[in-house]
Amino acid sequence: MIVKTNVKLNLGLSVLRKRADGFHDIETLFVPCYDFGDTLEIITGDDYSRTSAALFAKYGAPAGHFDASTISATDKLSDLQKALVGGPVEPTELSKSAKDEEKGADLPGNVAASYDGRLVQGISEDGKLMITIAREEGVDWDPLKDLCAKAYNILAQDFDLPPVKIFLEKEAPVGAGLGGGSADAAFTLKALNELCGLGLDDQRLSEYASKLGSDCAFFIFNRPMIGSGRGEVLEPYDINLSEYEIKVLIPEGVAVSTAEAYRGIVPREGLPSGRSDRLGEQKCLPEDPCASEC
């Protein structure tokens, strides 16, 4: 199964208060945005992948699977290739090549990466999940900790899932507040629900999604929603944006961690006395370019 994910926009964001669990209570309007998205393929272990050959060819590795001549972890890759074909395999540690040692790379066990870092592949310790992630700008995270892998694992806690292979090509900007990773997780949940015949409705899927990330549940419904709580409490909202052209500007090479962004916020309850926090009551500052229009 191959799906194209999308991202989301927040049309307004009000940070109300910091919670005891470390999250923030917010109010926001989520709307889907189809200008950006990733390509996700999920197949059972013995199915043929239409994505793998294209990914490996595009990112410099041979079609099919990794090869010792192009991959930093060398002598155990045949085990990765065999994984999921006949069911779970024994966990195996991947050794690092001399070139990789020179670069000081620190590969987790069971994870292989291309020399240029644009493609990584990992297999879970029980051998039931193989995940491959490709990104033009490089993949600097453990694929087994990606939200797609976490989506598989959270369903596997309650259901007897078959071994699967996940192929993900990251094209949506990372660290841009667009929810690309959350979308990948939500679409993984929906795909596994269909592939494995789990019979979960959107409400049940959203409950799983909310455990993976604050805005993951939105992508289960993928329509305009008012988000509250930490973003997982959703209420449908009718809005027609067809007459508007929304431009999304993303500075090249700039990525902001959501957690870091929230750490720098003073919630509404922390505003100085007398200060307005409503957008409609904001006044332009003298140095603001719009001051002459106010």
Stretches with model-predicted labels:
Residues 1-174, 194-199, 203, 251-254:
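ATP-binding N-lobe of GHMP and related small-molecule kinases
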Residues 176-202, 218:
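DPxDG-like acidic metal-binding loop motif
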Residues 14, 24, 177-183, 215, ...:
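Gly/Ser/Thr-rich beta-alpha loop segments that engage phosphate groups in nucleotides
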Residues 221, 226-294:
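Conserved, helical-rich catalytic subdomain that frames metal- and/or nucleotide-binding sites
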Residues 198-238:
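Glycine/threonine-rich beta-strand-loop-alpha-helix active-site module
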Residues 26, 139-141, 174, 178, ...:
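Short clusters of hydrophobic/aromatic residues that line enzyme substrate/ligand-binding pockets
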